[in-house]
Structures are given as C-alpha cells and as structure tokens.
C-alpha cells in the first residue's frame, strides 16, 4: 500500500493521522497542508465506511483508530448529553452517507500558502 511519509517516523505519522482524522470527525472541517489532507482523506473515508457498516467488528476497528475525545456536549431536557467522536461517527455522520458510496470528503485549496515555508494549504471537510 502506497502512502506518504510526511517527514515523520511511523509512530509519529500514525499518531498524527489518528489525531487529525478524529478532529475532522469532531469538527467536520479542518485547515491543513495539502499533502496531509490527502492522507487524512484516506483514513476518514475508511472510518466512515466502518460507521456505515455499524456492526460490532466495525465499531471495534473504528475505536482502535479514532481517539476517545469529547465531540459534543449539549443539554436535553434536564440531562447533559456528552457525545464522543466515535459516537458521533456512528450516530450522526455515518447515517448521513448511507446512500453514498465513497467520496465523503471535499478539499478546497486556499489562495495563500502558509507563512514561513509556503506550504499549500487546504480546507478539508465532510460533504
């Protein structure tokens, strides 16, 4: 399987991809460099596909990759509801794409590169 090294060793690269994929699931839009976004797109598509499957095996595979962070806190009636990134993936995001076969993310190139190293920046978001 081909992938980009992104100037990091394998553990650092995997941690970065896990973190950025989790942030994309939680916020549904992030700003990052173009090469990172292309890699995040792959992992996010796989996680959403697992979310669409929705069985126990898919939940365990997604839980092994997506970080356990709080995605949403809101009040319903007299209770405070706390939703993790994994719960948001399976209950909110996956049902949204039940009739869509892939292509869950979209990338927009930003006009101005990053200051300092002139890296091309993009916005990656869920469709």
From Swiss-Prot:
Record SUPFAM superfamilies: Prokaryotic ribosomal protein L17 (SSF64263)
Example of a GO cellular component annotation carried by this entry: cytosolic large ribosomal subunit
GO biological process: translation
InterPro entries with a match to the protein in the record: Ribosomal_bL17, Ribosomal_bL17_CS, Ribosomal_bL17_sf
GO molecular function, one term: structural constituent of ribosome
Protein keywords: Ribonucleoprotein, Ribosomal protein
Highest taxon of source: Bacteria
The protein's assembly and partners: Part of the 50S ribosomal subunit. Contacts protein L32.
Similarity remark: Belongs to the bacterial ribosomal protein bL17 family.
PANTHER family named among the record's database cross-references: LARGE RIBOSOMAL SUBUNIT PROTEIN BL17M, RIBOSOMAL PROTEIN L17
Protein name, UniProt field: Large ribosomal subunit protein bL17
Species of the source: Lactobacillus johnsonii (strain CNCM I-12250 / La1 / NCC 533)
Source organism phylogeny: Bacteria, Bacillati, Bacillota, Bacilli, Lactobacillales
Name of the gene encoding the protein in the UniProt record: rplQ
């Amino acid at each position: 399987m081909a992938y980009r090294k992104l100037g990091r060793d394998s553990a650092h690269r995997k941690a970065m991809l896990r973190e950025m994929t989790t942030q994309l699931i939680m916020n549904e839009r992030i700003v990052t460099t173009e090469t990172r976004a292309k890699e995040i797109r792959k992992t996010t598509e796989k996680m959403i596909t697992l979310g669409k499957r929705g069985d126990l095996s898919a939940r365990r595979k997604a839980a092994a990759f997506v970080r356990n962070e709080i995605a949403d806190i809101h009040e319903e009636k007299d209770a405070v509801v706390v939703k993790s990134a994994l719960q948001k993936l399976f209950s909110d995001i996956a049902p949204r794409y039940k009739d869509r076969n892939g292509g869950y993310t979209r990338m927009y190139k930003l006009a101005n590169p990053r200051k300092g190293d002139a890296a091309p920046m993009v916005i990656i978001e869920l469709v």
